[in-house]
Structures are given as C-alpha cells and as structure tokens.
C-alpha cells in the first residue's frame, strides 16, 4: 500500500495541491525535555500533577504553510471533525486541491467526503500506520517543542501558545517537511 501511495502521489498528483489534515493532543503539563543547570546540579522544573482534559488542535497544512485550525477540549469525534471541515477547512479549500487524511474513524464520515468534494476537491487517505508520509506530523513535532518551552499552565494560555507556535511554522519549514516525507516540490527562487 505504501509503494502504491508513493507511485500515485509522485506520478499523478502535484504535491503543491496536497492539503494534509490531522489533529494533535496537548495538555497543561507539557514541560521541556532538556534543560541546562550549573555543573554538578540537576536541572529541575515543576509540572502540575493534574493535567486536566486534553486540548485537541485540528489543523491543515500545505506546502505553503499551516492552514486554518480549531482547538477543542477533549478528543476528536466524528461530530467535531465534521464541524472543523464544514466551518473552518471547507471555506478555504480551492477547487483542484487534494485533501489527505489518516485513517482515524472520525475522518471517514460520508458528510466529510461530501463537504470536501462539494468544494471541487479530491479526498485521499494515507496508507495505514504511515505517519512518515504525513508532513503535518513533523509540523506538530515543532509545535509541541514550542509548547513545552512555553510552559502554559491554563487551557487559555495553552490555546494562545498553540496559535503562536503555529505562526512559527514558516513556508520554508513546510516545504522541508513535505520533501522529507518524499513529496517533490518545484524549486523556490531565492
């Protein structure tokens, strides 16, 4: 399936038409994984014991950068995902784009397909267990590192930090993530 995916995308679809959509969970107990301390002393930081409910970020990404996003308390359900597609993603889709989703059950609703195809776009699903083919996963890794550094301890601060972290993912980053996942993009003028 993975080889078929690479053949399909490499041979038939312009990578600049791809729109990857996924979700990332986070909470208020994120802390840096590495720290500096004076020689001979242990680096320390405080982390709340009660993480509270997860905050889920639903977002899209193209080769040009991060697209529209939505944060919700709790996890992604079919209703939450349909709401994201209908109110946030679909209004900015352009005819001819190809929306790529992973195989989460919430992504497979008929309403999701109708909303995407109704905008003149195509819907594709990644092969199972293939986060390495999804460049938004690499963007989320960068976002999570920035969230750890931010150390937000309230839900409101976490959502604000998510917005700031998403703004840091530049076009150059997105293009690099696409290329690292094997998608060929035309060279950009310097």
Regions found by a protein language model. Give the residues of each.
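Short functional hotspots at interaction and active-site rims
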Residues: 1-190
